[in-house]
Swiss-Prot record:
Belongs to the tetrathionate hydrolase family. This is Tetrathionate hydrolase. One of its GO terms (cellular component) is plasma membrane. Keywords: Cell membrane, Hydrolase, Membrane, Signal. It comes from Acidithiobacillus ferrooxidans (strain ATCC 23270 / DSM 14882 / CIP 104768 / NCIMB 8455) (Ferrobacillus ferrooxidans (strain ATCC 23270)). It catalyses: tetrathionate + H2O = sulfur + thiosulfate + sulfate + H(+). The gene is tth. PANTHER family: CELL SURFACE PROTEIN, OUTER MEMBRANE PROTEIN ASSEMBLY FACTOR BAMB. The keyword Flavoprotein does not apply.
Length: 499
C-alpha cells in the first residue's frame, strides 16, 4: 500500500500518523510501520507457514465468507456440504490446536487456589482464551484470542497457517473473512481508574476501554496475516463488526457507532448514541444495523448508509451491563434481544432474564417474556439468541436453562434445564441448529437437544470452559474454541452418538 505522504523523513511521518489517528481514527500502513516497528524475531512477530494452507478441493470447504459474529444475522453457524465434498469433511475430522496460552483442558481455572474457582473462571474467560467461537472459510479455521493473537489453521489437518498479534490488546471477536482480508476487533473488559472516576461522576457519559489500549479494527492479509490497516476507536471494541456492501459496522465502549470502508479502512460515518457496547456485536439486516448499549440501555437501529438513528428500544429493568452484552439476532422481519434485569425491590438478590422481540423496520414491540429467575451471575448478563425456521432458541444464565419461543408470537415451546454438574450461569452461548438437532456448548460440555421437544439426547465432555463460544458445524465436523485457549475439531458423529 503506497504512503499518502511524500518522504520528508521519519519524524514528519510519525507526526502525520499521530495527527491522522487523532482526527480520523485511521493510519495508513506505510506511516504506521515507521511509527510502530515490529521486531521480526520477537515473540509477537507474525508467523507464517504457507505450506500448511489447503489446496485443491480442500480450499473450497465451508462458506466463502464470514460476515457476522455467529456467522449471520440469525446466529446459526451451520453449513451443510454437498455429497461430492471431500470425504474428510463429510465424515468429520478430529484434532486439537493449542493456542499461545493453552491451559490443559482437564485443569481447573488458573489461579483457582488464590481467587476461588468461580472468580478464576470468569477471569480466564475474559483475559486468557477465546471469547467467541471460530470462523470457518474455504478450508481454514480463523480464531481470535484474549492471548492477543489471531490464528489461521487448516480445517482438515489442524496445522498452523499463520499467527499474528497486531496489537497488545485482547482479541475477543469472531474474525470476519471477506475476499483476501481478515478483520479483527480489539478491546478489553478492563477499566483504568480514570474510567472508574468518569463513571462515578456521570454514568451516562462513561467509557469502557478508553486509554486502556489500542482499540479498534485491524485488517490483515488473509494469506499471511500481515497488517493492512488499522481503524482506531476511543472505546473498546470487544464485539465483532458486521459487514455489508463493502462497509464494516462496529460499536464501541464509548457510545459510538462507525461505518468503515472495508477496503481502505477510512471512516464513512460516525454516530454517537452514548452508553457502552460490551459484547453486543452488530447485526446488519435489510439495510439497517442493530446493536445494544449498556448504561444507557437501548437497542439501536441505524441506517447502514449514513448512520442516522431509525429507532431505539429497550428491555424494561435491564441491568447496567446486561443489555450491552447480548448480540441481537434478526430474521423474518424480527429482531430479538434479551438481558438480565435488575433485582426487584425487597427481594433477595433474585434476577430475571427478559427477552423481547421488535419489528425490525419500525421498532414496535411484538412481545416480551420473562424467561425465569435465579441468583446473581458474574460477567456476561444474558443469552445469545439464535433463530431458525421462525423459532428463537435462547439461553437464560440466571436459571441455567435454554428455551424455544415462536418468533412471531412469543409462545413458549419448551424449557431445557442444563444439568447441575455444569457450572452456574450456564446458558450464555447461541445454540447451533443442524439437520434436525440442536447443539449447545456450556460449561465443559457440548449437548445435543431435540429442537422440537427440548429433550436432551446426548452430551460430550470436552473440558476447559465454554462461555459464549458457539459450535460451528461444517459437514460432519464441529469446530470449537474455548476459554482455555484451544481450537478444536470433533466429528459430529462422536457428539451426536453420545460419549
Amino acid at each position: 500500500m503506497p504512503s499518502i505522504v511524500r518522504n520528508h523523513g521519519p519524524h514528519n511521518k510519525i507526526l502525520l500518523s499521530a495527527l491522522l489517528l487523532a482526527l480520523f481514527g485511521w493510519v495508513p500502513l506505510a506511516s504506521a510501520a515507521v511509527a510502530v516497528p515490529m521486531d521480526s524475531t520477537g515473540p509477537y512477530r507474525t508467523v507464517s507457514h504457507p505450506e500448511n494452507a489447503p489446496s485443491g478441493v480442500d480450499a473450497g470447504v465451508g462458506p466463502s465468507e464470514w460476515t457476522h459474529a455467529y456467522a449471520n444475522p440469525a446466529h446459526n453457524a451451520a453449513f451443510p456440504v454437498p455429497d461430492d465434498a471431500p470425504e474428510w469433511i463429510r465424515n468429520g475430522v478430529s484434532w486439537l490446536f493449542p493456542e499461545a496460552r493453552a491451559w490443559p483442558l482437564a485443569n481447573p481455572p488458573f489461579g483457582s487456589k488464590t481467587y476461588g474457582a468461580a472468580e478464576a473462571s470468569v477471569t480466564q474467560t475474559q483475559f486468557y482464551g477465546n471469547a467467541l467461537g471460530p470462523s470457518v472459510v474455504d478450508g481454514v479455521v480463523y480464531a481470535e484470542s484474549d492471548d492477543m493473537f489471531a490464528y489461521a489453521v487448516n480445517a482438515k489437518t489442524g496445522k498452523l497457517i499463520w499467527r499474528a498479534s497486531p496489537v497488545g490488546n485482547n482479541l475477543m471477536g469472531n474474525p470476519l473473512v471477506i475476499g483476501n482480508t481478515v478483520y479483527l476487533s480489539a478491546g478489553s473488559v478492563a477499566f483504568n481508574f480514570a474510567n472508574v472516576l468518569r463513571y462515578a461522576h456521570n454514568p451516562s457519559a462513561s467509557a469502557r476501554g478508553l486509554n486502556v489500549s489500542f482499540n479498534g479494527i485491524y485488517a490483515l492479509n488473509r494469506s499471511n496475516g500481515k497488517l493492512l490497516w488499522y481503524f482506531a476507536t476511543p472505546g473498546e471494541t470487544m464485539a465483532t463488526p458486521a459487514y455489508d456492501n463493502n462497509t464494516l459496522f462496529i460499536a464501541d465502549g464509548a457510545g459510538n457507532a462507525f461505518g468503515i470502508n472495508a477496503t481502505t479502512g477510512k471512516q464513512v460515518w460516525k454516530t454517537h448514541v452514548g452508553g457502552m457496547d460490551n459484547m453486543s456485536s452488530v447485526t446488519a439486516y435489510r439495510h439497517n444495523i442493530y446493536f445494544a448499549m449498556a448504561i444507557k440501555p437501548y437497542l439501536y437501529c441505524l441506517n447502514e448508509s449514513n448512520g442516522h438513528i431509525v429507532w431505539k428500544g429497550t428491555i424494561p429493568g435491564a441491568s447496567n451491563t446486561g443489555i450491552g452484552d447480548v448480540s441481537p439476532a434478526a430474521a423474518d422481519g424480527v429482531v430479538v434481544l434479551d438481558a438480565t434485569t435488575k433485582p426487584q425491590a425487597n427481594k433477595k438478590a433474585m434476577f430475571s432474564n427478559v427477552i423481547r422481540a421488535f419489528d425490525a423496520k419500525t421498532g414496535a414491540v411484538l412481545w416480551t417474556r420473562n424467561m425465569g429467575s435465579g441468583g446473581k451471575i458474574p460477567a456476561f448478563k444474558g443469552g445469545v439468541p439464535m433463530i431458525h425456521n421462525n423459532i428463537v432458541y435462547v439461553g437464560n444464565p440466571v436459571a441455567s436453562t435454554y428455551q424455544a419461543y415462536e418468533l412471531k408470537t412469543g409462545k413458549l415451546l419448551w424449557t431445557w434445564h442444563v444439568p447441575t454438574k455444569v457450572a452456574a450461569g450456564a446458558g450464555r452461548s447461541a445454540p447451533t441448529y443442524y439437520k434436525g438437532l440442536l447443539y449447545i456448548t456450556t460449561g465443559q460440555y457440548i449437548f445435543v437437544v431435540n429442537p422440537a421437544t427440548g429433550k436432551e439426547l446426548h452430551q460430550h465432555h470436552i473440558g476447559g470452559q465454554f462461555g459464549i463460544e458457539s459450535p460451528v458445524i461444517v459437514g460432519g465436523t464441529v469446530y470449537l474454541t474455548n476459554s482455555w485457549d484451544w481450537i478444536m475439531a470433533i466429528p459430529l458423529k462422536t457428539i451426536s452418538h453420545g460419549s
